[in-house]
């Protein structure tokens, strides 16, 4: 596999629980709210699983836990298990990588985050992802 990590240098978009980035000087309590959602990871995990499974109906996905060993089109249950392992207290400082070869897009799920990051998505892919996240109460935005 080519070096997909070069995609981390490309433009990226965020799939998030919030419709836009919270300003650093916000009067709200972003970090407390984020911790609230992180304590309820199973619900957030289910949303990410449903989005990625639906996306997998349209595109092949290669999934990796270490960035070296990749598996093409995990069974739905295996994809759910992999995402759950990371979002529900998986390896500290670890990420789960989903590569969409046809789109040359890398999706990263960080174990301690309430979002997924899409690196180098095409406009067509962004349009599809925006449609898929709506039923889950998620949003897509560019930092």
Question: PLM ranges: what are they?
Answer:
Residues 1-115, 119-143:
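Structured alpha/beta or helical-core interaction and ligand-binding surfaces enriched in interleaved
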